[in-house]
Amino acid sequence: MKKRFMVQPLCTGLICAGMFTACMSTGVGAASQTGGSVHAGTGYIPLEDFFKNPSKSRFTVSPDGTHIAFMQAWKNRMNIFVQKRGSDTAVRVTAAENRDIADYFWANNSLLAFLQDTGGDENYQLFTVQKDGSNLKNVTPFKDVRVEIVDDLKDNEHEMLIAMNKRNPQVFDVYRLNFTDDSLTMIAENPGNISGWMTDHDGKLRVAMTTDGVNTGVLYRKTEQDPFEPIMATGFKDTFSPLLMTFDNKELYVASNLGRDKAAIYTFNPETKKQGKLIFEHPEVDVESLIYSEKRKVITGAVFYADKRGYHFFDTQRAELQAELEKKLPGLEVGISSANRDETVYIVRSSSDKTPGAYYVYDTADKSLTLLADIAPWIDSTKMASMQPIQYKSSDGLTIHGYLTIPAGKQAKNLPVVINPHGGPWARDYWGYNPEVQFLANRGYAVLQMNFRSSTGYGKDFWTKGFKQWGKKMQDDVTDGVRWLISQGIADPKRIAIYGGSYGGYTTLAGVTFTPDLYACAVDYVGVSNLFTLFETLPPYWEQGRQMMYEMIGDPEKDKALLEEVSPIFHIDNIKVPLLVAQGANDPRVKKEHADQIVNALKQKNIAVEYMVKDNEGHGFHNEENRFDFYRAMERFFAEHLSADR
């Protein structure tokens, strides 16, 4: 059951998380055979093995526990399949040929709902289909309209709540969708300032999150007949993020950093407008996620991310279940991704840094754990490289956390390195299986990922230290990571590349622009090159956050000099190393103009640049054939300019 929906990535407790993060489906391999790093040899793994579609993925169990759905490739696109629990025979229920299905869920015991966009435009439409594949319908066939799920109303077999920007492209209203006749009834009109909605445990719309671009707030009502009233107002630099209501539907569980640096879990009384009991805190990182039992009506634990994912359990039954699963799957990260209504059948996902893992079904009746599928059975975990948590100091004394992956069988000495800054930038990198990282390591490159300042999860102070620091202190944190690798003797100073997507693409361009002697080459993937263009081309449903972004990045009018100073497009003359630029033609976040501008300017200066554009992609390459093309180009490019010896 979805209890909370934010219509845009602005105030989710990780403010603006993932706004400029490339949305690539990296899958889970014969590659171009040129250059010192891509010849076949001991340990060589075909490129396609890293980036082809998973064997099967995204397993879910029906509410009654009798059927299991999953996604699998058909005609190179991810489609939905359904099988009876205990059976190996599956029925394909969708026939997507042009675009992967983005997400799906069980609407009731016999009906599935799924979201799909067109060519990466992120205007998701909602479809329904019977579990036998019959009666497929597009229930929101509206042009240039984006659909999101507010609440799937698990206890209501005939309806769900969705949000759409149909009336006004800048804001999302809430509609009740009836599956019986496919009717849509607006139940809440957005006055213009609401950025998210939340239901109670009865599916009633009780909470709304607001923003005026700089300040954020929370609205509450006792019943759906009452008007919304404000219960909290903060500046956007503070986190006060409703997670779900208590099970009596009277109070809220919230993630809050009011009066503190790290966000923690509290209760909040909407009648008194007072923050209540501290539920859980972590001394080093933000805590912004709860797990709970809908059947038993208890919160069972909190989830946090330090170097790796961690749990803190409040509930003996859930703690014992976790211990049992970890005992059955030793050495792996284990989580529950789906459950039936009675919580007697669970879908379990395992993974690690060396394997994308597998899905299992766990039956509480006999405590059996049965393998459903390996996500990528062709990946041999014994041939993968270890991802090690690391930390180093920035030039002004901050501790920067990150991950270093050394090629399997190699000493951490004088290696060619790919620096891989994450997108967002208000996001973070995590420990776990990463096909890009493993691919690069298999080709002989060490990979450094770092959570530079303004990465989320490390507290308010660390996050705000990156405001108006694009190309400055945020960039220095990346540069300091490179210099740390060199000082440790890990990196060969003459064989260092930088590659990133979205904000990471900006960091890539800034790296070769502002530290032109540090890198041998660079790969910019759907990256920002011009901050003025960025603000001129925001998607309409990001308008609510424009002023907030001005505070965080810079105002095109008030901070014109700053934006010119840190936009790579205005400093082309500094670039002197080869670039590979990749872009989706339909990108709604970082428009193609960014790539066009940087490529045209480089060509005019006779600077070596390769340009790949995919017409049927958006903010990242989802289609398998496009992933293959991109990584083949990257493989050849790095082989030519870094010459890693295997």
Where are the regions that the model predicts?
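Beta-propeller domains
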Residues: 70-91
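Mature N-terminal segment immediately following signal peptide/propeptide cleavage
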Residues: 40-74
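C-terminal motif of bacterial Sec signal peptides marking the signal peptidase cleavage site
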Residues: 21-22
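Cap/lid segment of the alpha/beta-hydrolase catalytic domain
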Residues: 378-494, 501-502, 507, 536-546
